[in-house]
Design a protein with these regions (language model features):
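ABC ATPase NBD coupling module
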Residues: 69-82
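Conserved ABC ATPase signature
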Residues: 121-125, 129
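Hydrophobic anchor residue at the start of the ABC signature
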Residues: 135
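Catalytic Walker B motif of ABC-type/P-loop ATPase nucleotide-binding domains
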Residues: 146-150
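Helix N-cap at the start of a conserved alpha-helix in ABC-type nucleotide-binding domains
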Residues: 157-159
Length: 211
């Protein structure tokens, strides 16, 4: 299965990637591609993202920009291939402490966030605020590949639109690629360059480029 165009070397390539509950998977992403995956709960969607992010051990091979996963140290890979889980994780008392360089006012406003939110205790932030800040934290690493696990599932329509716009702008500016798990068919129609379904660990292509 592929989302390639005319590029000689795909940005991301999977060959025979498998794990418990995940059948051998082949996938290729070209720069600026946005691959959407849907499917029932427990079908292997999140597992695939975790495998690509090198968070779970697996069999098979993965290449990034023509370089094999084995050529990277773990932290190097996870900076270049970044995952945003459904429920963002935080380990400092406030969001600001998670950034080497704080996001600018425009970046915050683009996601409908105020500067003050960076210094508020994490426990006082809404789910939507945490998720939007987690996206900014991920983008601060300038990843080549974004792995997004239902990033807008708990957001309202306005925040969803802002997240979509920010991801789309980042992809266009940087040439990055995205694997986006979503159950929102309309969202996939708006953004996807290719669509897949996951069922019982098997990934199947179902749709082409968004209009």
């Amino acid at each position: 299965m592929t989302s390639r165009g005319n590029a000689e070397t795909p940005l991301l390539r999977l060959a025979g990637v498998r794990h418990d509950g995940l059948e051998a998977t082949a996938l290729e992403l070209e720069p600026r591609s946005m691959v959407f995956i849907s499917g029932p709960s427990g079908s292997g969607k999140t597992r695939l993202l975790r495998v690509v992010a090198d968070l779970d051990a697996h069999h098979g091979d993965i290449w990034l920009d023509g370089r094999h996963r084995g050529e990277f140290k773990g932290h190097q890979w996870r900076h270049r291939v970044g995952m945003l889980p459904t429920e963002s994780r935080w380990w400092h008392k406030d969001a600001a402490s998670h950034f080497a360089s704080l996001p600018g006012t425009e970046a915050l406003k683009g996601l409908h966030l105020e500067t003050a939110v960076l210094k508020r205790p994490i426990g006082q932030l809404s789910t939507g605020e945490r998720q939007r800040l987690a996206l900014l934290r991920l983008l601060a690493n300038a990843p080549r590949v974004l792995l997004l696990d239902e990033p807008t599932a708990r957001l309202d329509a306005d925040s969803t639109g802002r997240v979509e716009d920010r991801v789309r702008a980042y992809v266009e500016e940087s040439g990055a690629a995205v694997i986006w798990v979503s159950h929102d068919e309309n969202q996939a129609k708006r953004l996807a360059t290719q669509q897949f379904t996951m069922n019982a660990g098997r990934l199947t292509a179902t749709g082409g480029r968004a209009k």
